[in-house]
Each structure stands twice: as C-alpha cells, then as structure tokens.
C-alpha cells in the first residue's frame, strides 16, 4: 500500500510539472499561468502525446525514468515561481485513503487476457505493424494504456500499472472536497452527486468494494473513462455557467482523453461541440485546437498501423 501511495504521489508531482509545460506552450496569456488540481489533465495528455510519438521509434521503457524526472524538474519550477495552488496534504489524504481501500483488490479477467499484454507491447517494443493479427484483442489502442506504459515501474512484486488508475479518481474527489468556487452551482452539485453515487454504490454492494471500485488494482480503462466522462460533463456545465476559456480548454482535453481511452465514450464529443457551435461561445487564439487536431492525427495513425483501421 505504501508503494502504491508513494508511486502515485510521485507521478502526481511529475504530472503537475507537465501541466505547467503544457500551459506554458499553449496558454494565450503566459503571465496568468496558475496550476490547480484540474490542470493535471493537461499533464496527462502531454505525457500521452510524448509517448505516442516516441513509441513510433523506441520502446517506452527506454524513456520512462527520463519522462518522470523531467516532470519533477518542471514541478520544482512551479514551486520556485509560486504559480501552483493545490492543497498537497489534502490530495495526499484522499490518495492514501483510496490506496488503502483498494489495496486488497485482485486482478480481473480482462487484465490477464489483454490489458497487460497491450501495455507490455508499448513498454517493451516500438510500435508493431499489424499487431492485431496476433490477437484481435490487441487492437485496443487506449491512450490510457500508453500512459501506463510510460509510468511502468516495478519494485520487487509491486508494479505501478496496477495502481495508477487511482489518480483520476483522486483528482475527482479532491475537486469535490477542496474546490472553493463551486458552492450552490449545478456543476458542483453534479460532481458531488457523482462522488456520492460511487461511494454509496460501494457500500451497498455485497462483495468487497462493489463492482465499480473492485476494478481498481487493475490496468483497465473502464473506470478511467468513467472519471473523465464525469469531469467532461462537469466542465461542460462550468462553461455554461461561467463562459470562461479555461473550462472550455479543460472540456476539450478531458473529452479527447475520455474518447481515446475507450472509444465507446465517443458521445462525450457532443459537449465541446455544443459549447463551441450551439452556444456560440467562440474563444480567440486557441492554440489548444491545433494541439487537439495534432493529437488526434497521431492517435489515428497509430490505430492504422496496429489494425489497418483508423478507429
């Protein structure tokens, strides 16, 4: 359990560094850069795009330590510049709680059948042409598995790929407990009720932590895509309530991660389309659009190489 907590917290700090890097490159007003809890989403997609490109040429295991350390360096810069606004103790408490209750979770069937294998292929080998010909299950091209492949570290019998899924859940509950500008808003109420449902369902279910929480401790994608769907809907409501560019940015990136994590969540794309077109809320100089197009292109190319199909 302590390994799980330490690994997740270290990766969390590294992701904050990549969040700073992302905002430094993409933000329209660099003098207004401030890193908060939800900005970790930027860090996640930055690591994923680096991994997607790198895996065309090398196995991700070759750069795992480098990527982690670079993120830590940028995180230290945010501390030096005092541009980070996160309750680190609060995040640690929530993370420790989930690491504790998920410690005894076992592996599910899907993990052994194909999740671990798809992670292994990205971690140990550069991209393989026609990988799905070996097994149709290898056609799963989840960006979350790419993310896990980057941060795959093994210490004795402990392997980080089994526990990193706890991070998105921690981000969700941190926002519920520590967000101070959401009171009495529908967006916050939606987020709060989503958290209550997850906890209540876990208590009601007769077997261990319930069907949903029993998935944790596995390198699966169902719970991760679920969390990003909840966050995407939250950002969608925030866009309607406050009409701020930062929430549209988060909505767009969160939706992309959600879809590319599990394609069955593709309906989430309706949220950013609605805000951008139906609501007529246009935002100027959005470099994030160019990034999103580039990210999608790389993901489609990877799909085509693995399966001869773009999706």
Model-derived regions: residue spans:
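Membrane-interfacial entry segments at the cytosolic side of transmembrane helices
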Residues: 60-64, 83-90, 185-189, 246, ...
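Membrane-interface transmembrane helices that cradle and orient dolichyl/undecaprenyl
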Residues: 224, 229-248
């Amino acid at each position: 359990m302590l390994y799980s907590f330490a690994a997740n917290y270290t990766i969390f700090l590294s992701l904050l560094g990549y969040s700073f890097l992302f905002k430094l490159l993409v933000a329209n007003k660099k003098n207004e850069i401030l890193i908060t809890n939800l900005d970790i989403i930027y860090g996640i997609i930055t690591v994923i795009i680096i991994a997607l490109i790198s895996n065309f040429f090398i196995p991700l295991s070759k750069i795992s330590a480098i990527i982690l350390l670079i993120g830590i360096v940028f995180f230290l810069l945010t501390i030096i510049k005092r541009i980070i606004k996160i309750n680190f103790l609060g995040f640690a408490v929530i993370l420790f709680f989930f690491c504790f209750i998920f410690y005894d979770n076992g592996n599910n069937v899907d993990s052994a059948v194909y999740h671990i294998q798809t992670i292994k292929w990205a971690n140990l080998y550069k991209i393989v042409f026609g990988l799905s010909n070996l097994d149709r299950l290898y056609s799963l091209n989840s960006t979350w598995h790419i993310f896990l492949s980057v941060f795959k570290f093994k210490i004795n019998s402990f392997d980080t790929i089994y526990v990193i899924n706890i991070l998105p859940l921690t981000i969700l509950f941190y926002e519920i407990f520590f967000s101070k500008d959401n009171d009495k808003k529908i967006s916050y109420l939606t987020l709060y009720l989503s958290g209550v449902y997850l906890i209540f369902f876990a208590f009601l279910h007769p077997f261990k932590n319930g069907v949903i929480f029993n998935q944790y401790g596995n390198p699966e994608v169902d719970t991760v895509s679920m969390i990003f769907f909840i966050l995407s809907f939250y950002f969608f409501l925030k866009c309607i309530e406050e009409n701020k560019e930062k929430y549209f940015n988060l909505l767009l990136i969160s939706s992309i991660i959600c879809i590319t994590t599990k394609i069955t969540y593709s309906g989430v794309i309706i949220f950013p389309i609605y805000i951008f077109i139906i609501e007529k809320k246009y935002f100027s100089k959005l470099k994030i659009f160019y990034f999103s197009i580039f990210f999608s292109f790389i993901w489609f190319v990877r799909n085509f190489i693995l399966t001869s199909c773009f999706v």
